[in-house]
Amino acid sequence: MPKRILQGVVVSDKNEKTVVVRVERRFAHPLLQKTVRRSKKYKAHDENNQYKVGDTVSIEECAPISKDKTWTVVSAQSK
């Protein structure tokens, strides 16, 4: 099964070797047909503590690292 890759913005880097990434998705509301935005936060592994708040990053699904972390940061797009 292929690994999922998501893009989001780093919203917290206070934990050691961990960043919190907010991933936003958009979809059409089934009744109103209006575009709705929903977001979800993922904890991702950052081995070198190199990503800071505001960075746009790609995260990839991986084997569980801890109770909450099952994603790793792959690369950064921009600030």
UniProtKB/Swiss-Prot annotation:
Family: Belongs to the universal ribosomal protein uS17 family.
Subunit structure: Part of the 30S ribosomal subunit.
Signal peptide span: none
Alphabetized Gene3D superfamilies for the sequence: Nucleic acid-binding proteins (2.40.50.140)
HAMAP family recorded: Ribosomal_uS17_B
Any single GO BP term: translation
Upper classification of the organism: Bacteria, Pseudomonadati, Pseudomonadota, Alphaproteobacteria, Hyphomicrobiales
Coiled coil: none
Protein name: Small ribosomal subunit protein uS17
Function statement: One of the primary rRNA binding proteins, it binds specifically to the 5'-end of 16S ribosomal RNA.
Keyword annotations: Ribonucleoprotein, Ribosomal protein, RNA-binding, rRNA-binding
Recorded GO CC terms: cytosolic small ribosomal subunit
